[in-house]
Amino acid sequence: MIKQALISVSDKSGIVDFAKSLSDLGVKILSTGGTAKLLADAGLSVTEVADYTGFPEMLDGRVKTLHPKVHGGILARRDLPEHMAALEKHDIPTIDLLVVNLYPFVQTVSKEECSLEDAIENIDIGGPTMLRSAAKNHRDVTVVVDPADYAVVLDEMRANSNAVSYKTNFRLATKVFAHTAQYDGAITNYLTSLTDELQHSSRNTYPATFNLAFDKVQDLRYGENPHQSAAFYRDLSVPAGALANYNQLQGKELSYNNIADSDAAWECVKTFDVPACVIVKHANPCGVALGADAHDAYAKALQTDPTSAFGGIIAFNREVDEAAAQAVAKQFVEVLIAPSFSAEARQVFAAKQNVRLLEIALGEGHNAFDLKRVGGGLLVQSLDSKNVQPHELRVVTKRHPTPKEMDDLLFAWRVAKFVKSNAIVFCGNGMTLGVGAGQMSRVDSARIASIKAQNAGLTLAGSAVASDAFFPFRDGLDVVVAAGASCVIQPGGSMRDDEVVGAADEHNIAMVLTGVRHFRH
């Protein structure tokens, strides 16, 4: 039975109403600092923890609740006579309900101007200590770390003479340990990220222990396949341009595959500064184009592979206006992503309520690491964020690319980074002409890319080709030249580079090397 509660929260949403309801149920309220003032100003009878313990807050508030009268009242087992006798001897009442959430460490370190000093001051000490004490003694103490649980606790108290069930206490305690683990992990990750800087080291040091913490956004209907269960989680610190920040304007619930493909499309389209459209199917771009506006870019992107675009994901880096919306509405599309949709575009899609419209701000989308699970382990690497500049390219053939060819090569190279390896991409005039993806041999990707262009009725004469990794033999080069390519961009680095460059000279095409590989698995 809950007779006394201690409330100390950073997130004050709903706390006044919750405390009023507790008071109406006859529960005495202890509190600290800003929370105590808020509750008192709302007309509630509140006892400051400093008055309760007889010991003042000290060290600029660093020591508030670290006192035996607080932790004894939380940790004492009510079923052990010796524990209760100890409380009586030292005049320590029980604390039956603890309502605490922690200093906003993650929000603090997410700010660009955050200093190490700011971060340190936002490491909560008393809060986690009380939470862990209450969660450990969950048989006797109800502990609430999430405002979403206020209503559940009140409903049970009202129905059971101020008592909360063991089942609920156990669930809330489990939530606490997940929360404190997440909190400590965020602190560890932040401090680890500063290690090299503080040691004046340029090494890319990875932590000895890698902590992951994500909040669940929603359960999904199923995973990659219907027999797999799934859920979507959001990083604690989400960059402004991340897919996880989407605002869904309309449409059915997103599926596992929708989310994965949407991320691929969104990250690709954001790499372009001019109006662009990216169409993705099964995590691979099947059409990418630049245009005068969203409508123009979409019309070009669709030409690459209209068959594969059916039921795909479409992303724009400009507002979708009425013209673009009317064009897209003519085909079956799963998800449409853009920084914004005009009112007229929204009206067009109002007649197609199953189409999922996602608004996401332009900006950085991923944090520092790329993660991949393997059996019993985790692969961690930095993001593939390298974009080569024209001055970094090395022309290795007798013929140099023309300015137009160089523009097409750089466009093709940017697209190839987002195509599953082995990747071959034909481009021309700011649009993809044929995409060969995910083949075990590079020459097969080249053949598929040329076939795709042929099927779409697109000419490859004078086209530019990007290969995400080097040509191990000249055969792949021979295929793209036979299809019509006049220039090629690739990393180089093969034992047979001389043979491949010689073949390029033999065909009188231009070849540039990036020195950068873009494998994507």
Swiss-Prot record:
Keyword annotations for this protein, in alphabetical order, are: Hydrolase, Multifunctional enzyme, Purine biosynthesis, Transferase
MGS-like domain mapped to chain residues: 1-145
Recorded catalytic activity of this chain's protein: (6R)-10-formyltetrahydrofolate + 5-amino-1-(5-phospho-beta-D-ribosyl)imidazole-4-carboxamide = 5-formamido-1-(5-phospho-D-ribosyl)imidazole-4-carboxamide + (6S)-5,6,7,8-tetrahydrofolate; IMP + H2O = 5-formamido-1-(5-phospho-D-ribosyl)imidazole-4-carboxamide
Q: What is its EC number?
A: 2.1.2.3, 3.5.4.10
Cell wall biogenesis/degradation: is it a keyword of this entry?
no
> Entry's InterPro entries?
AICAR_Tfase_dup_dom_sf, Cytidine_deaminase-like, MGS-like_dom, MGS-like_dom_sf, PurH-like
Could you tell me one molecular function GO term of this UniProt entry? IMP cyclohydrolase activity
* A Pfam family it matches: MGS
Q: In which pathway does it act?
A: Purine metabolism; IMP biosynthesis via de novo pathway; 5-formamido-1-(5-phospho-D-ribosyl)imidazole-4-carboxamide from 5-amino-1-(5-phospho-D-ribosyl)imidazole-4-carboxamide (10-formyl THF route): step 1/1; Purine metabolism; IMP biosynthesis via de novo pathway; IMP from 5-formamido-1-(5-phospho-D-ribosyl)imidazole-4-carboxamide: step 1/1
As for family, the record states:
Belongs to the PurH family.
Protein name, UniProt field: Bifunctional purine biosynthesis protein PurH
